[in-house]
Amino acid sequence: MMLKRKYGNRADWKRVIKRKYAQTYLDNGEYKGYITLLNTIKVTEPLSVRYGEKSVCIVDDGYMWLQQFPNNKNHSVTTMFDAGGNIVQWYIDICLCNGIDNDIPWMDDLFLDIVLLPTGEIIEKDADELEDALLKGIIDKPLYDLVWNEVKTLKGLIRKGSFDLIKWSHSHKGILSNRLK
């Protein structure tokens, strides 16, 4: 089974020409897992994504991406901050697992993603990629079902205001901001 492994330091991201990065392992009673922070000091060009009529700039000079890799969970959250420190979106990857390799946190991506905008709007992304992966035998039916169950659970938590990872975006960013190198 070939899933795409995504690393927290995003070392292969060509768009980012000057960067700072920090990571740490947290175990504070509330959260257990790695957190990473990438500061895109200089980029070749800004990157915007479209959601219907909306265009959201997710990376530009001075942006920060906080990624949370909670232990024993089937998701990882990337909070994207603009240069003023405002959250532009939360990007929730559904994943097989989170891990660490050569001291860099990673997650094995399971195709389907949830985007949460500061307005509260929830967008499901890449359902077609998930269907395709099932048809091609990249994932099996139990894994396919795990993804949809995870999405349903997370959307329920978000709607109730009890998905804690998004509440901790600012505090987790604060922990790493002064460690950026």
Provide a role label for each language-model segment.
Residues 129-153:
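Short, surface-exposed, low-complexity cationic segments
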Residues 52-101:
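The feature represents the first ordered module of a protein
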Residues 90, 142-144, 175-181:
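A short, hydrophobic/aromatic-rich structural module that often spans a beta strand
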Residues 1-64:
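Charge-rich, low-complexity N-terminal segments
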Residues 150-181:
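Cysteine/selenocysteine-centered motifs that mediate thiol-based redox chemistry or coordinate metal-sulfur cofactors
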Residues 84-137:
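Conserved, surface-exposed functional patches that form binding/active-site neighborhoods
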